[in-house]
Amino acid sequence: MSILDLIKTRRSIFPEQFNRKEIDDETIDILLESANWAPTHKKTEPWRFKIIRGDSKVRLGEFLARKYKENTVKFSEYKFKKLLKKPMLSSVVLLICMQRDHNESIPEWEEIAAVSMAIQNLWLTATDLNIGGYWSSPSFINKMNEFTKLNSGERCLGIFYLGYYDKKTNERVPGSIKNKVSII
């Protein structure tokens, strides 16, 4: 498959769509290695990943549901239960973190962009391996230091759910690029 075809077939696949097949350690290593090849200004390589498997997924679900309940004005029992189950429906969950350059030699947005490019690499590799993925950034993502230790200058940008899936994904047709480009 060409890189353009791979980009065009990448989709958000949600945990409810995952089957029970486990992603093995070797495959996780391949996904993370692809992320590690993302471009980065001044070679800061700010991406950091925390792998969540097994019983830690239960703990994550409980944490997410509790934080939702604590931080939401319009509480929904449905959403509470969904957050509780989401990690357990996934083969692997990654916390997407960014380690800020301690010298702050480049703007923070560039490091966030580098982490985003690392995720795009990982996501495209997952797509190529028939693994589904979904990046979630709940409103309380800045509370993840209460779930796991983060280093000084490190912060969590999102949660990436991974799993194999069976169903064919829907086709996506983006708006025309002509409406998004101007010539100067």
Predicted feature locations:
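Short, electropositive alpha-helical surface patch
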Residues: 146-157
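Short secondary-structure junction motifs
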Residues: 44-47, 128, 157
